[in-house]
Each structure stands twice: as C-alpha cells, then as structure tokens.
A protein has these predicted regions:
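Acidic/charged coordination and interface sites in well-structured regions
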Residues: 3
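Bacterial flagellar/type III secretion structural subunits and associated motility module proteins
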Residues: 6-235
C-alpha cells in the first residue's frame, strides 16, 4: 500500500508540474517587454503557488554597457605619429591587459582604427570594438563592455591608459580613446508600483516569470505594461 501511495503522489506531482509548465504568459506590449512563464521549485514548493497571475510593470531605464567612443578623425588622413611599436593598457575589474600594435608609415586613421578593432575583438578581453563612420568622411573607434549594468566594484567596467605601458605611448591621447565615456546603467522598472532594478535587461520576477526588456523598441518609457498568464483555455 505504501508503494502504491508513493506512486500516486509521484504521478500527482508530475501532473502538477506538467500543468504549470503548459501555462503561457503574455505582455500587452510585447515589442517593449517579452515574457515567458518558467516557475521554479524551492524546497519542494513551486513558485507557481507564490507568483501572481497578473501584475503591472513600467520601465524607467534600460540596462546599458560602458561605451568609450574615440575622437572622430578624417578616415583617409595619415596618422600624425611616428611609425613604430605602440601599446596601451586595458584594465578591467578582474584583469590587466597590454595591447601591442605597430604603426606603419602611411597608415591612415581608418587603417589604424580597424587594426585596433581586430586586435581587441580577437583578444577575448570582455569588451568588443567597432569602427563608426559619420557623413563627413570621419571615423571613430568605439569600445563597448560585454557586461551590462553598474559594476559590482568601481565605476567602470574597463579603463584605457598608456601612462605606464612597455612600448611607445601617446596613442590613447592621439586617438582620443577616453574622449567620450558613457558609463553603464542598470535597468530600472516598477512591479505593481514597487521600484526594482537589474544589472541586465533579462531578469526573473516572482521567480516564475522571465522578463526581457527591449531597448530597441520605440515605445515610451513609464508606460504601464500588463503582464500575466492566459486563462487555462488559452494556454
């Protein structure tokens, strides 16, 4: 009898878990907030029992990475620095990297910026780089942290300097690698009027809903967004 009872309990639990997993979440602004329903179990109790079937959220800000954008320089103009070996240090909260590169006679700003972009992107430093172009024939190197949100330590995800580097210095100042620094921000939002924040744009609410904010949407901030579960017939 005990074995039969345990079997029935197991089947009941499996049926409940299957029922919970088939429920479908909705957002009435899916372009701004997408949602999935993924309840978890903690100490034998599913978050299904604690999570509300409906809540209202609004977004005040999105999580962003740190971005350093260099000076915009005429792309086709030769670099006005002596040819030779240069280096600069990229310092993160965890590691200290020295990036070494050569400047060849006749290298243009665009050539050098793309060389540094490839060097950074091939080095697995926790940042990535791209060359930006404007309508005036100028280009800039933008370096962006892979991490989003306010750093756990310090104010920056990374810092660039050539004050104590091992090869020729001066390229950080010449290119303006620290000219425009956009610091990282946390996502800021409310759940049923209560202020919340997150390091990233994907996070869990009530340990049952996985929410993803979409900064690329053109929707106005502070819009009230309805999130919840479809009634069973629509699940």
């Amino acid at each position: 009898a005990k074995s039969l009872h345990e079997t029935i309990d197991t089947l009941s639990c499996d049926d409940e878990n299957q029922l919970f997993s088939t429920k479908t979440a909705y957002s009435d602004h899916p372009g701004q907030v997408s949602v999935s329903y993924e309840p978890t179990e903690n100490q034998g109790v599913s978050s299904y029992y604690k999570a509300p079937a409906h809540f209202v959220m609004s977004i005040q800000d999105y999580a962003t990475p740190q971005r350093n954008t260099s000076s915009y320089l005429t792309s086709s103009q030769p670099v006005m620095m002596p040819a030779g070996s240069y280096s600069f240090d990229l310092i993160t909260n965890k590691l200290h990297y020295e990036l070494q590169f050569d400047l060849q006679p006749g290298d243009t700003h665009d050539t050098l910026q793309h060389r540094l972009m490839r060097l950074i992107n091939n080095s697995d430093l926790g940042v990535h780089a791209e060359v930006l172009q404007d309508d005036s024939g100028r280009s800039a190197l933008q370096i962006t942290s892979d991490a989003y949100g306010i750093p756990a330590k310090g104010n920056e995800h990374f810092r660039i300097t050539d004050d104590n580097t091992s090869h020729s210095s001066g390229m950080v100042h010449y290119l303006g690698l620290n000219k425009d620094i956009e610091t990282a921000r946390n996502a800021a939002y409310t759940i049923d009027g209560e202020p919340q924040s997150s390091y990233g744009n994907t996070f869990r609410v009530y340990d049952a809903y996985e929410i993803t904010l979409h900064p690329e949407s053109a929707a106005d901030k502070n819009t009230e967004i309805q999130v919840g579960l479809y009634p069973d017939p629509q699940s």
